[in-house]
Amino acid sequence: NDAINGIMTSMVEDKTNIAFGIIPNGIGNDFAKYWGLDEDNYKAAVDWIINRRLRKIDVGRCNYFDGEKHTSRYFLNAIYIGLGARIVQISDGTRRFWGIRELSFVASMFLLLFERKLYRTHLCINGEHIRGRIMTVCVGSARGYGLTPSAVPYNGWLDVSVIYRPELIQLFSGMWMLLQGRILNHKMVKPYRTRKVKVLRAQNASVSLDGRILDRHFPLEITIQPEAITLIIPN
């Protein structure tokens, strides 16, 4: 994410002339998986970078106030508001305790499984104002760790999934549907497709951007910049 933001904020006039590649690492790297990159086969990723097959892809942009100034942060995968960002927060904390990424991720999921905390939220999507107590919102240029499974990182659109609080039995069915890539069929999930999202309010909700916790003050304005950067993709 730092590399993407470095490119997007550089003084280079045509940023698509800069190509970047991915050597996947970590847990749940579904942006890499979308392109067929295997976390366990870094040698193949290096070979693909050397072969240099290029594809222009979209870049998401989040405008916000960081407490001192208005600023922007760019992303390739997704922004989470609420539960998804809490998982990032807790997994970072438990990683310091456990020392193992996989164990910290599973521990954070378990700790939050029964929390199902709701946040008073006000969104504006395609001119529609959405108000209510919402568990999590995912705004994805790509698949967003499974919550925006229909998103395509080069179609010029943002996919949005607004998730309301499920009953406990619905939570388990939702987890199964998430793993199967069918989360949009869950009755507590409302999907949208748009080019701009305004998050006017999400009371006490954490926000993560491509796995980073964002120090922010609402409102947020999330937009998409079509084919703004060049990715080296597998053959």
Short names for language-model regions:
Residues 1, 24, 211:
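Aspartyl protease active-site motif detector
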Residues 119, 148-149:
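Anionic-ligand binding region
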Residues 136-145, 151, 181-182:
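Phosphate-binding core of ATP-grasp and ATP-grasp-like enzymes
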